[in-house]
Swiss-Prot record:
Keywords: Aminoacyl-tRNA synthetase, ATP-binding, Cytoplasm, Ligase, Nucleotide-binding, Protein biosynthesis. It comes from Acinetobacter baumannii (strain SDF). Coiled coil: none annotated. CDD domains: Anticodon_Ia_Leu_BEm, LeuRS_core. A motif ('HIGH' region) lies at residues 47-57. One of its GO terms (biological process) is leucyl-tRNA aminoacylation. This is Leucine--tRNA ligase. The lineage of its organism: Bacteria, Pseudomonadati, Pseudomonadota, Gammaproteobacteria, Moraxellales.
């Protein structure tokens, strides 16, 4: 073969565009809907087209690309697609701010970000690209909605929302700031409006059970989070008979997982929206005002534990089901109507929220559990202690039930109350049905029609998709679809009368719950996914994304897979066989603080740093004025802290390969990555050294390729061993461990070994050549542009290259290094045959000149640790 010559210096911004153009021209990464042989589907969570890539994107997509390129080298056909999660509130907000249609803003962002992603050098099949805001995509979302509605898996009910009376619009919880609308500043009201819900609770047990099938492929942390979110509990429904039958005949039913504490109930609390609360407020203006206050300031479930406890007595009473004692009914803001029956039996002695409430309103506290290892005399009704909430213990102050432990008490109360119709055992889930209606414009239209005669009617399938008008510029005052009769005026498909099209749109989590399936056949016009493509590519073999999506997105995608499975669209029960959750990208923060406490954050790119000899930052100045700023430590890159590093700037300065290598080397993928300019420079230096190694080798012009294994010098044996050990390690690190950082470390070691090696004959040259081409092939998943360019000099096309095979014979050692100690201190080293005898080893150890000078007295002991060391005790 002919050896080429290359520029002695690495010029990333010259080679990367030409390599990318080559991939595009040859459609290297295009795959068919169905393929023969080994194949694999690698997917990173698709981005929202916010306008610019951030470093979190770079990390996510580089991880996916490293895995994809690795399996391509292993001879597999790999599907790695890309698309855009394109509906959503940020586009509406940007449209309002810039007076531009969300569609225009979104597609301009997509064009820019697509260009950025291509510059990263991703091995993506761009022919499969789609945006979820196109009718070709959401047509099939609407089709599935219609099927599910007909099966009863979607229903409509009233739901409480945040209403901005000035902007005349519904606000998401995060758009409410201190009780006011984020844009108008108006006091937010609570309103009840009809919304559509998915019956995800019908699948709660299946969603829980099938987590067991993901045990080997998903992080334990994510499985635990999903289990907790689904929240299966076995408890008891207990009815407290009414003591005011003339007002409320039915009694009050509660659900509890702590039936063992029943004898400690001192009051019952209901949610503000509970029918009993509303009944009690009919002739009580003060109570009615309190209920309204609770409605306006409703607390999210996540904040319940820390929110201030508010309550008011209803004046009504219920009877304790065992003792008949009358217990007051209170309205409490920590009870949610959406959980259980909207009522709780309060046991202040053994529940922290009840304890806090009882102390605030001077309600009785009665201890009924004597926790194991706790002194009964230690119980204090004024200061909560951790053991008060323990299930481990025996009942006290509970009459005939004294001495029983948790399960025995549960069984005893059930046996006593069930025959009276006052209790039954019940399994309950924390998971709530999924409300998907959004009073927003920029989303998928809900394919429903409201008819005064026929009620809610699905849009006929031959009229799908219901297309969202795209030439709309929202002004922030409500959903513009409500002002567009050309959109909402329609005829009822059932009776033919005038009807109104639904103007709510779907939660954008719906689009991202099935997109992975659409990639298998994105141009298919006969359904969600072509059956043979679904059979070929699904489920996704490896899914990659941030751990912040551990609950909602992943749960909804699992739910949708089961819905599609039950519709016969896909096979199998789970969408993602393996999941890798990457950590956050952190960067230094810098700020100044005004007298009023307001902080102004400065981007690291505009900061001049002074470091100590260990590289730690000791002072920082803003380059705009030369004045000092406060060093805030490392935090997640974010707009709020202004500490994002623009990936484009890194690519422009160093090249995509440097950005990729840094991202993969700086930390294990599941841990936080600390941004470091020095680390980026280090990655770039590494690639420059690889380039120079190849340039130097090519310069010598020796084209020897055949290795004569029987006649290798010791140095050549060592380099071959290093080469094949590296193949073994990199393969294991990428495939099994996802330890990309240690894979790169191994490549750095192979580079060092290759640099030190001096070829003395053709056999040595062939060994060196093997080491270099192996290094380039193993580096290819991380730095594909550099690898493709350099491998071409050896006559290899990276796109057709295969992962090197390990030569087991290269791993065997004929010699070994033995450490020689005198009295436990290192005094010398020996290179000896692996089958040397003990006597010969001792003789050679004693003969070492650097050892002999310490052998001054008689030798008391000779210690030999096989294959490792000799220790002579004198």
């Amino acid at each position: 073969m002919t050896i080429s010559h290359i520029d002695p210096e690495y010029q990333a911004n010259t080679i990367e565009p030409s390599v990318q153009q080559d991939w595009e021209n040859r459609k290297v990464f295009k795959v068919a809907d169905t393929v023969e042989g080994k194949h694999r589907y690698i997917l990173s969570m698709f981005p929202y087209p916010s306008g610019k890539l951030h470093m979190g994107h770079v990390r996510n997509y580089t991880i996916g690309d490293v895995i994809s390129r690795f399996y391509r080298l292993k001879g597999e056909t790999v599907l790695q697609p890309m698309g855009w999660d394109a509906f959503g509130l940020p586009a509406e907000n940007a449209a309002i701010a810039h007076k531009v249609a969300p569609a225009k803003w979104t597609f301009e962002n997509i064009a820019y970000m697509r260009d950025q992603l291509k510059k990263l050098g991703l091995s993506v099949d761009w022919d499969r690209e789609f945006a979820t805001c196109t009718p070709e995509y959401y047509h099939w979302e609407q089709w599935l909605f219609v099927q599910l509605y007909k099966k009863g898996l979607i229903y409509r009910k009233l739901s409480t929302v945040n209403w901005d009376p000035v902007d005349q619009t519904v606000l998401a919880n995060e758009q409410v700031e201190n009780g006011r609308g984020w844009r108008s500043g108006a006091l937010v009201e609570k309103r009840d409006i009809p919304m559509y819900y998915f019956r995800i609770t019908d699948y709660a047990q299946e969603l829980l059970d099938d987590l067991d099938t993901l045990q080997d492929g998903w992080p334990q942390q994510v499985l635990t989070m999903q289990r907790n979110w689904i929240g299966r509990s076995t408890g008891m429904e207990i009815t407290f008979p009414s003591a005011n039958t003339e007002i409320y005949a039915d009694g009050l039913t509660v659900y509890t997982t702590r039936a063992d504490t029943l004898m400690g109930v001192t009051y019952v609390a209901v949610a503000a929206e509970h029918p009993l609360a509303l009944k009690a407020a009919e002739n009580n203006p003060e109570l009615a005002a309190f209920i309204e206050e609770c409605r306006i300031g409703s607390v999210a479930e996540a904040d319940l534990a820390t929110a201030e406890k508010k309550g008011m007595a209803t004046g009504l009473f219920v009877k304790h089901p065992v003792t008949g004692e009358e217990l007051p009914v209170w309205i409490a803001n920590y009870v949610l109507m959406s959980y259980g029956s909207g009522a709780v039996m309060a046991v202040p002695a053994h529940d922290e929220r009840d304890f806090e409430f009882a102390n605030k309103f001077n309600l009785p506290i009665k201890q009924v559990i004597d926790a194991k290892g706790a002194d009964d005399a230690d119980y204090s009704a004024t200061e909560w202690q951790e053991w008060y909430g323990s299930k481990e213990g025996k009942l006290v102050n509970s009459g005939e039930f004294d001495g029983l432990e948790f399960q025995a008490a549960f069984d005893a109360f059930l046996a006593k109350l069930e025959p009276q119709g006052l209790a039954n055992s019940k399994v309950q889930f924390r998971l709530r049905d999924w409300g998907v209606s959004r009073q927003r414009y920029w989303g998928c239209p809900i394919p429903m029609i409201n008819c005064d005669t026929c009620g809610q009617v699905t849009v006929p399938e031959d009229q799908l998709p219901v297309v969202l008008p795209t030439d709309v510029v929202p002004d922030g005052s409500g959903n513009p679809l409500n002002k567009m009769p050309e959109f909402y005026e329609t005829k009822c498909p059932c009776c033919g009368g005038d009807a109104r099209r639904e103007t709510d749109t779907l939660d954008t989590f719906v689009e991202s719950s099935w997109y992975y399936a659409r990639y298998a056949s994105p141009d298919f016009t006969g359904g969600i996914v072509k059956p043979e493509a679904a059979k070929n590519w699904l489920p996704v073999n490896q899914y990659i994304g941030g751990v912040e999506h551990a609950i909602l997105h992943l749960l909804y995608a699992r739910f949708f897979h089961k819905l599609m499975h039950d519709e016969g669209v896909v096979q199998g029960n789970e969408p993602f066989t393996n999941l890798l959750t990457q950590g956050m990208v952190l960067a230094d923060t810098f700020y100044r603080e005004a007298e009023n406490g307001k902080k102004t954050w400065f981007n690291p790119a505009n900061i001049e740093l002074e470091r100590d000899e260990k590289g730690r930052i000791i002072s920082a100045k803003y380059s705009g004025d030369g004045q000092e700023v406060i060093i805030g430590g490392q935090e997640k890159m974010s707009k709020s802290k202004n500490n994002g590093i623009d990936p484009q700037a890194i690519i422009d300065q160093y090249g995509a390969d440097t950005a990729r290598v840094f991202m993969m080397f700086a930390a294990p993928p599941d841990q936080s990555l600390e941004w470091s300019d020095a680390g980026v420079e280090g990655a770039n230096r590494f690639l420059k050294r690889v380039w120079r190694l190849v340039a130097s080798f090519l310069e010598k012009g020796n084209s020897a390729t055949a290795i004569d294994k029987a006649n290798l010098s010791k140095d050549a044996q060592d380099l071959r061993r290093k080469t094949h050990e590296t193949i073994q390690k990199v393969s294991d690190d990428i495939e099994r461990r996802h330890a990309f950082n240690t894979a790169i470390a191994a490549l750095m070691e192979l580079l060092n070994a290759s640099n030190k090696f001096e070829a003395k004959d053709d056999n040595d040259v062939a060994v060196e050549r093997e080491a270099i081409t192996t290094l380039l092939t193993l580096l290819a998943p991380f730095a594909p542009h550099l690898s493709q360019t350099l491998l071409a000099q050896f006559g290899t096309d990276l796109t057709e290259a295969t992962f090197p095979e390990v030569d087991a014979s290269a791993l065997t050692r004929n010699t070994q290094t033995i450490v020689v100690q005198v009295n436990g201190k290192l005094r010398g080293k020996l290179e000896v045959s692996v089958d040397i005898s003990k006597d010969e080893l001792l003789a050679q150890a004693k003969a070492l000149p650097e050892v002999q000078q310490f052998l001054t007295g008689p030798t008391k002991k000779e210690i030999v640790v096989p294959n490792k060391l000799v220790n002579l005790v004198v």
